[in-house]
Amino acid sequence: MKSSTTSMQLIPTLFFLTILLASPEMVEGQQMCEAKSLDWKGMCLKWRNCRQVCISEGFTDGRCKGFTRKCICSKPCFVLPN
């Protein structure tokens, strides 16, 4: 009976770790800056292709967004202190 209790305690821990590892790395308070891809041509229908183009442009991610399906690249914003 003790092993089933241990298993039941392990499930929430594994779930939490999965969520933690799957979430994007981002410092608290840090915003993401977005820009339209310069190299993408045409409508954006496959976000994986958009992401690869954005990475080749120096961004960390890319997604198809908007009604007109543009490839939008993103990366963490860096704000200089005053």
Swiss-Prot record:
Disulfide bonds join C33-C77, C44-C64, C50-C71, C54-C73. Gene3D superfamilies: Knottin, scorpion toxin-like. Keywords: Antimicrobial, Disulfide bond, Fungicide, Plant defense, Pyrrolidone carboxylic acid, Secreted, Signal. The modification Pyrrolidone carboxylic acid is found at Q30. One of its GO terms (biological process) is killing of cells of another organism. It is found in: Secreted. SMART domains: Knot1 (SM00505). Belongs to the DEFL family. This is Defensin-like protein 7. It comes from Arabidopsis thaliana.
